Amino acid sequence: MRLLLVPAVLASLLPLGYAAESSTVRCPSAKPKPLKFSKPTFIDKERAGGEPVSIVAQDGSIIVSAHAGTTHIYKDPQAAPGAYDFLRSYYNQTLNWRSTDGGKTWTYVGLAGAPEGPHSPTSTGFSDPDLTMDAGGNLYNVEIDLANVAVFGSPDDGQSWPTANPIAASGDRPWVTGAEENEVFLYVNLPKQLWRSTDGGLTFSLVSTSFPADSKLLVDPLNPKKGLLGPLGSGGVAISPDDGQTWKDYPAPLGDSTQFFGAIAADRRGWVYAANAGGYSGSSDVEPNGEVTFNYFNRQTKRWAKAPIRIPTPKGDALWPWIIAGDDGRVAVTWYQTHAGKEDKFYAYVAYTTNGHGSTVRCSDGSKRFVPPQFQVANASGRPIHAGKICLSGTTCNANPSFEGGDRRLGDFFTVNFDHKGNLFVVSGDTTLKNALGGPKPVANPIFIKQTAGDKMLVKPDKTRKTRCLFPLPTC
């Protein structure tokens, strides 16, 4: 597949005018400002934090949820002294935190807002969290026991999670998508199912068991009352105009990828974006052949760009892409990156663009010229978030006779998002903390990394409202 190399584009597109300078014509640059991030901070140093997800509530607070660690436990005997991180908050439920100061401090969320304990009275499931919000500001999360799929909700901006359907479905790797007020869709990966609730997640009706979307669905910005967008496993988008009843799929030209789940984003104008990150093939991989590729989908022509754009990366390997979009053309991609010669050290990288579907600039001679998406790339974590191997075999990692080769503490993915001001942030697992005896911990801990410089995902901040009262208090 032909790749569009971003650095090479500068030369090859001089006639098209990307920041071009010649004796006669000058064209403005479309490249965003350099991107910088804070040092990683731990959301919690004493609780598990693999596969973290996030949502920004309508009051501006940030909610993070993570895997409880049951199927992520590191089997190295030296990790046993760190078992407290797994045991202290194990209630056969996922773990949840909330920040009201932009991620500076975090509060663990238990029953009725308590700082300890289980989060819901009836929901059960130690793994596979996912967060979403409906148009009314109600939050939803999901968790599984490798059999039941439980959906639980928060009517108070993530301060508590009092409502739940403990058996909304059955299967592995669910995702939730909030739509109209009290409407939430539940996607289950295996066996494939799509469910819909119109009563705030209390009951669900089956929509389909045969559709092309693979992984987390999005509400279609161009059809917010009925439309859904879903990623294709091989790269691309599936579009439904009727609440998931019918779909049309559009495969995307993309490079190799090491990922369990397809990932797409849609900006507020309706443009769709996809990214792949690949090269890392597992615990025995020492070849630095990684790549990160990006593409964009035009809703009017119903076509992807003919060639994917290769985002600049250091020589090494890449895996587990995630993508988010804000205002028109503003897109960010995150992935884990290794550096050549240091194959066992993994960093969290982020790339972003403010002209994600290309842009037209006016040059000094008055001509208009097209500029393809331009990216800035940052080593967001600045330090390794994991040293060692990463197992790519899902729950079967536990059967690996080598504890290092079966290391699954990070889970299967991590995510990027932005706050109500448009600042990017990454939530990831981190395995660098030591137990009391100096050995590794049996689970990862959750970290938060926030943008400190660069353009924002929003031209103007989203409006926020007053925080709702802790459920079920009528006033506060």
Model regions: which residues?
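Secretory targeting and sorting signals
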Residues: M1-A20
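Extracellular, repeat-based ectodomains that mediate carbohydrate processing or recognition
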Residues: S22-C476
